[in-house]
């Protein structure tokens, strides 16, 4: 839980999951403005409900969604679209490290997430959270 987390771990999670996203958006802005481009960020189901032992992680994922929605409104009049992908449990090295080996048929594959992201990029959506669920693939 939070009481057992080192300050360094808190800062690292916030730096990667929140500040990293903010800095990417800020640095990309001039290019996005010139090209009417778009940004896609990734969240997790933890954004909808805080998870025990994941308070910092969950709160940064919630911040991701709010940041995406705010930027979509802020930059929409410039033709810049900003969205968020929320993949269900996906087989990744980080997931395996945190949860161990899980049955293959219960996890999304990275390619599923990539295909859904590509479909989002060719859509006209902005300010949306796109849920990718195994049963929908």
Where do the PLM segments sit?
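Short, small-residue-biased leader/transition segments that mark boundaries at the very start
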Residues: 1-6
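Active-site Tyr-X3-Lys motif and surrounding loop/helix of classical short-chain dehydrogenase/reductase
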Residues: 8-15
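Hydrophobic positions on the long internal alpha-helix
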Residues: 24-28, 32, 67-68
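Short connector loops in the HATPase_c
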Residues: 33-35, 77, 126
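Catalytic loop of short-chain dehydrogenase/reductase
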Residues: 38-63, 68-77, 89
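Hydrophobic structural elements of the Rossmann-like NAD(P)H-binding subdomain
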Residues: 40, 82-85, 95
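C-terminal helical subdomain
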Residues: 84, 92, 101-137
């Amino acid at each position: 839980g939070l009481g057992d987390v080192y300050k360094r771990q808190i800062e690292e999670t916030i730096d990667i999951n929140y500040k990293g996203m903010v800095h990417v958006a800020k640095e990309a802005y001039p290019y996005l403005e010139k090209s009417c481009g778009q940004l896609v960020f990734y969240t997790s189901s933890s954004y909808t409900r805080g998870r025990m032992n994941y308070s910092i992680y969950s709160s940064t994922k919630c911040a991701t969604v709010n940041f995406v929605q705010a930027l979509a409104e802020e930059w929409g009049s410039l033709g810049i679209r900003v969205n968020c992908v929320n993949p269900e449990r996906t087989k990744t090295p980080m997931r395996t490290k945190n949860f161990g080996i899980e049955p293959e048929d219960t996890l999304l594959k990275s390619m599923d997430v990539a295909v859904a992201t590509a479909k989002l990029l060719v859509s006209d959506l902005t300010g949306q959270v796109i849920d990718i669920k195994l049963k929908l693939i």
